[in-house]
Amino acid sequence: MRRVMLGVYAAVGLAGLTAGTTVTRAQHAHGGGDGHAQGHLAAQACASEFEKVVGEGRGFGLAFAADQNGYPGPMHVLELKDRLTLSADQEANARELMHAMFTESRPKGARLLEAEAKLRRLFAERVADEAAVRAAVAEVERARTEVRLVHLLTHLTTRDLLTEDQRRIYHEARWGALAPAQ
């Protein structure tokens, strides 16, 4: 199983290197090449999606460590409720967990987004120096930690709502059979 995961990570890493090479070639191509702009536009789109999702209280992958390893989140459990054949109680409990998670995560997400904006402003306003950047990055990471903890801890609780069979079905639906879901 670890060999399978290592293979997946190696393939993803290799794909990233290949994509990086393609972008580099496009940047250095004669005639101006627009790979550079496309790469930055893709990064900006990702940053915009991050802001939208985190602003809504969602985790934007901050709980992958849990989800990939058999600790599902309530939102995805509800998305798969028919396949999981959730009982009425399970569905109600998952909804409560999701509501509580979003309620706690939204203000923490807003703090994270504000900390990220503050870091960007340091550079945009040309006032960045080592001390200011270190302080701003520390603030960003404190805020990110708080958002991430909300999501990871909710995944811990959500796991207990499901039977072993439901966890297996969930994991296969979300991740294939790459990791144990016990």
Residues covered by each model-derived region:
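Bacterial N-terminal signal peptides
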Residues: 9-18
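Bacterial N-terminal signal peptides that target proteins for export
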Residues: 1-9
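Conserved, well-structured beta-alpha core segment at the onset of a catalytic domain
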Residues: 2, 19-22
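Charge-rich (acidic/polar
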Residues: 23-182
